[in-house]
């Protein structure tokens, strides 16, 4: 399950395979379906079914993870994602192949 979060920029998501359920609307999104989320959108979703859920997602801005009261608990953006990638490479004795943002 992807925890409740808010996007500060646009989101474009294309389901490649599998299904996911949007928690607040109970909408099911399947293979070949494109979803646009405007800046400020808050959502949560989970993969459903037996097939792996593979989604191509392009985001701009930050992804802010929220607690039950709507307070930001942490965030992800280009810089935090790159730092996590770099740390993973170091932990596995690999040289990063992507440049810093």
Annotate the PLM regions.
Residues 12, 20-44:
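Short acidic-glycine-tyrosine-enriched beta hairpin
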Residues 15, 32, 55:
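Hydrophobic pocket/interface hotspot
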Residues 2-7, 24-27, 45-48:
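Short histidine-centered beta-strand/loop micro-motifs
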């Amino acid at each position: 399950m992807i925890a409740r979060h808010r996007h500060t920029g646009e989101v474009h998501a294309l389901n490649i395979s599998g299904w996911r359920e949007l928690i607040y609307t109970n909408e099911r999104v399947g293979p070949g379906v494109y979803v646009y989320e405007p800046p400020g959108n808050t959502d949560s979703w989970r993969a459903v079914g037996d097939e792996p859920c593979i989604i191509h997602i392009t985001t701009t801005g930050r992804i802010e993870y929220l607690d039950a009261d709507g307070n930001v608990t942490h965030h992800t953006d280009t810089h935090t994602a790159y730092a996590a990638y770099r740390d993973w490479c170091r932990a596995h004795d690999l040289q990063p192949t992507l440049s810093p943002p």
